Regions:
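Extracellular polysaccharide-degrading/modifying enzymes targeting complex plant/algal/animal polysaccharides
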Residues: 1-216, 221, 228, 234-236
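Hydrophobic, small-residue-rich alpha-helical packing segments that form membrane-like cores
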Residues: 236-266
């Protein structure tokens, strides 16, 4: 990546204090919920937060704390300490916010885990609490991300949140490109107990959270709208009655498209 990396001082563009990166997942101790997240887009396509390996996963070698944790006969550990293989993680020892993404116990329960420290002698990751809900097992697939030292492929990027500097390895010529960063960390529409309100023909994009939230209320209409390039769910309707979603396009969202719930569950 030498000579191909570009950097941007976000303060020059009015982007000030940056919140810590917080990611969850189904198995996360932080809860299965949308955590607003910044994303970088190049000509409308999401870029990759710098990671290793560049594709696929590596496996946990062992879980050193044998605390007797067992689920359905599968042995693991509730303690966030993981043995890794090889020398690569030694490069990350001074990185400020290393994350590991993996399926730590079951192949359907994912989470992002923050690394508190790396013991290069023991080849051990020490994770921050709260730990993954189901715990951890040897052989679990994972990859590391949010690593400045691992920008080595076109499309990878990293944000130094303390300095406000964004680093990017562009996948093509920047001169004619649209490079966009999603910075809004709340829904574009939050309608709580709102009734008889319509939204027509609007485009909501480049948000880090859910796009539109309607909670309670009645007879709200969202028609012919577009929700795209966001970090959470596109449109959330929770409770209320007689709401209508009509002819909307929802795509390129980080979590899901439409999430509709309600009714009498008794």
């Amino acid at each position: 990546a030498r000579g191909k990396l570009v950097q941007v001082d976000l303060a020059r563009y009015g982007i000030g204090e940056l919140k810590p990166l917080r990611l969850g997942g189904y198995n996360s101790g932080l809860g299965f919920t949308t955590h607003p997240v910044m994303e970088l887009f190049f000509n409308g396509e999401p870029m990759t937060l710098a990671r290793w390996p560049n594709e696929g996963f590596v496996q946990v070698v062992d879980v050193p704390v044998k605390d007797g944790h067992t689920i359905h006969g599968l042995e693991g550990s509730k303690t966030g300490r993981l043995i890794y293989e090889g020398e690569r993680p030694a490069r990350w020892k001074d990185e400020p916010a290393v994350l590991l993404y993996g399926y730590w116990f079951f192949g359907w329960a994912d989470s992002y885990e923050r690394v508190a420290s790396i013991d290069t002698e023991k080849r051990e990751f020490v994770l921050e609490e709260p730990y993954a809900g189901y715990g951890y097992r040897a052989g679990a697939p994972y990859y590391a991300l949010n690593l400045l030292s691992e920008i080595d492929m076109p499309g990878e990027w990293y944000l130094d949140r303390a300095a406000g500097i964004l680093y990017f390895y562009p996948p093509a010529d920047l001169s004619e490109a649209a490079v966009e960063l999603s910075v809004i960390d709340f829904p574009f529409v939050q309608a709580d107990n709102v009734s008889h309100t319509s939204f027509r023909g609007l485009v909501w994009e480049l948000g880090g959270a859910n796009g539109v939230e309607i909670r309670g209320g009645s007879q709200c209409l969202i028609a012919g709208c577009t929700v795209r390039r966001g970090g959470g769910d596109g449109i959330v309707v929770a409770g209320g009655n007689s709401h209508t979603l009509l002819g909307c396009d929802v795509y390129s969202m980080g979590r899901g498209g439409l999430l509709v719930s309600g009714g009498d569950r008794k």
